[in-house]
Amino acid sequence: MTYVVTENCIKCKYMDCVEVCPVDCFYEGENMLVIHPDECIDCGVCEPECPAEAIKPDTEQNLEKWLGVNAEYAKTWPNITQKKDAPADAKEF
Protein backbone atom coordinates (compact mmCIF):
# COMPACT_ATOMS: atom_id res chain seq x y z
CA MET A 1 0.00 0.00 0.00
CA THR A 2 0.99 3.61 -0.50
CA TYR A 3 -0.63 6.98 -0.15
CA VAL A 4 -1.56 8.98 -3.24
CA VAL A 5 -1.85 12.71 -3.88
CA THR A 6 -5.00 13.44 -5.89
CA GLU A 7 -6.47 16.33 -7.88
CA ASN A 8 -7.39 18.33 -4.77
CA CYS A 9 -3.70 19.26 -4.49
CA ILE A 10 -3.60 20.93 -7.90
CA LYS A 11 -2.98 24.66 -7.42
CA CYS A 12 -3.11 24.29 -3.62
CA LYS A 13 0.21 22.85 -2.51
CA TYR A 14 -0.22 23.62 1.18
CA MET A 15 2.70 21.29 1.98
CA ASP A 16 1.75 20.55 5.58
CA CYS A 17 2.24 16.91 4.60
CA VAL A 18 5.90 17.46 3.75
CA GLU A 19 6.70 18.53 7.31
CA VAL A 20 5.44 15.29 8.88
CA CYS A 21 6.68 12.70 6.37
CA PRO A 22 9.33 10.56 8.11
CA VAL A 23 10.82 9.29 4.82
CA ASP A 24 10.73 12.43 2.65
CA CYS A 25 8.75 10.76 -0.15
CA PHE A 26 7.12 13.94 -1.52
CA TYR A 27 8.11 15.45 -4.85
CA GLU A 28 7.20 18.92 -6.05
CA GLY A 29 5.84 19.96 -9.41
CA GLU A 30 4.79 23.43 -10.45
CA ASN A 31 1.13 22.96 -9.47
CA MET A 32 1.03 20.00 -7.09
CA LEU A 33 2.96 17.49 -5.03
CA VAL A 34 3.18 13.73 -5.55
CA ILE A 35 4.22 10.80 -3.37
CA HIS A 36 6.81 8.30 -4.59
CA PRO A 37 4.96 4.98 -4.15
CA ASP A 38 8.16 2.98 -3.61
CA GLU A 39 9.41 5.32 -0.88
CA CYS A 40 6.14 5.73 1.05
CA ILE A 41 6.07 3.51 4.15
CA ASP A 42 2.29 3.71 4.52
CA CYS A 43 2.41 5.35 7.93
CA GLY A 44 -0.48 7.66 7.07
CA VAL A 45 0.71 10.69 9.03
CA CYS A 46 0.44 12.90 5.94
CA GLU A 47 -3.24 12.25 5.24
CA PRO A 48 -4.77 14.19 8.17
CA GLU A 49 -2.30 17.06 7.67
CA CYS A 50 -3.64 17.92 4.21
CA PRO A 51 -6.20 20.76 4.46
CA ALA A 52 -7.30 20.08 0.87
CA GLU A 53 -7.98 16.39 1.64
CA ALA A 54 -5.88 15.49 -1.39
CA ILE A 55 -4.02 12.53 0.14
CA LYS A 56 -5.70 9.14 0.08
CA PRO A 57 -4.61 5.55 0.71
CA ASP A 58 -4.33 3.61 -2.54
CA THR A 59 -6.84 1.11 -1.18
CA GLU A 60 -9.66 3.56 -1.94
CA GLN A 61 -11.53 3.02 -5.19
CA ASN A 62 -10.85 4.85 -8.44
CA LEU A 63 -7.33 6.01 -7.61
CA GLU A 64 -5.51 4.07 -10.34
CA LYS A 65 -5.07 7.19 -12.47
CA TRP A 66 -3.60 9.17 -9.58
CA LEU A 67 -1.35 6.33 -8.50
CA GLY A 68 0.09 6.39 -12.02
CA VAL A 69 0.48 10.18 -11.95
CA ASN A 70 2.30 10.01 -8.60
CA ALA A 71 4.61 7.21 -9.75
CA GLU A 72 5.43 8.91 -13.06
CA TYR A 73 6.16 12.39 -11.77
CA ALA A 74 8.03 11.27 -8.64
CA LYS A 75 10.70 9.96 -11.02
CA THR A 76 11.39 13.39 -12.53
CA TRP A 77 10.26 16.10 -10.09
CA PRO A 78 12.61 17.26 -7.31
CA ASN A 79 12.28 15.85 -3.81
CA ILE A 80 10.86 18.30 -1.27
CA THR A 81 11.68 17.95 2.41
CA GLN A 82 10.67 21.32 3.86
CA LYS A 83 7.37 23.14 3.76
CA LYS A 84 7.13 26.21 1.56
CA ASP A 85 4.41 28.84 1.37
CA ALA A 86 1.28 27.83 -0.51
CA PRO A 87 0.50 29.77 -3.69
CA ALA A 88 -1.27 33.08 -3.04
CA ASP A 89 -4.40 31.89 -4.85
CA ALA A 90 -4.53 28.42 -3.22
CA LYS A 91 -7.78 29.10 -1.37
CA GLU A 92 -9.55 29.87 -4.65
CA PHE A 93 -9.14 26.26 -5.72
Curated annotation (Swiss-Prot):
Gene3D superfamilies: 3.30.70.20. [3Fe-4S] cluster binds at C9, C17, C50. InterPro entries: 4Fe4S_Fe-S-bd, 4Fe4S_Fe_S_CS, 7Fe_ferredoxin, Fd_C, FdxA, RnfB_subfamily. The lineage of its organism: Bacteria, Pseudomonadati, Pseudomonadota, Alphaproteobacteria, Hyphomicrobiales. The keyword Transport applies. PROSITE patterns: 4FE4S_FER_1 (PS00198), 4FE4S_FER_2 (PS51379). One of its GO terms (molecular function) is metal ion binding. This is Ferredoxin-1. The gene is fdxA. NCBIfam families: FdxA_Protbact. The keyword Metal-binding applies. [4Fe-4S] cluster binds at C21, C40, C43, C46. Its cofactor is [4Fe-4S] cluster; [3Fe-4S] cluster. Keywords: 3Fe-4S, 4Fe-4S, Electron transport, Iron, Iron-sulfur, Metal-binding, Repeat, Transport. Binds 1 [4Fe-4S] cluster. Binds 1 [3Fe-4S] cluster. Residues 2-30, 31-60 form the 4Fe-4S ferredoxin-type domain.
